[in-house]
From Swiss-Prot:
It comes from Methanococcus maripaludis (strain DSM 14266 / JCM 13030 / NBRC 101832 / S2 / LL). CDD domains: ACT_1ZPV. Residues 5-79 form the ACT domain. It holds the Pfam family ACT_6. This is UPF0237 protein MMP0657. SUPFAM superfamilies: ACT-like. Belongs to the UPF0237 family. Gene3D superfamilies: 3.30.70.260.
């Protein structure tokens, strides 16, 4: 398995989860775990996604998600799991 961590943050509105998961499905990525919450009007989501069988390469998926974030008004970050864990260790 090759996992990435995807974080999504922005003002809450309908369709954010649907749009992000649509891009992942179109690229044959598999959601391993997902957590999402709304804090007042702030949408936050973190996903663990297996990209070992994606139909594109990592950089193409990253660009597609960044473009989607711009289109729907949220910030989407994609990091390999080991980098995410290293950056957020205590």
């Amino acid at each position: 398995m090759e996992n990435v961590v995807i974080t999504v943050v922005g003002v809450d509105k309908p369709g954010i989860v649907a749009e992000v998961t649509k891009v992942l499905a179109q690229n044959s990525a598999n959601i391993v775990d997902i957590r999402q919450t709304i804090m007042e009007d702030l949408f936050t989501m973190i996903m663990l996604v297996d990209i070992s069988k994606i139909s594109s390469d990592f950089s193409e998926l990253n660009v597609a998600l960044e473009k989607l974030g711009s289109e729907i008004g949220v910030k989407i970050n994609v990091q390999h799991e080991n980098i995410f864990k290293y950056m957020h260790r205590i």
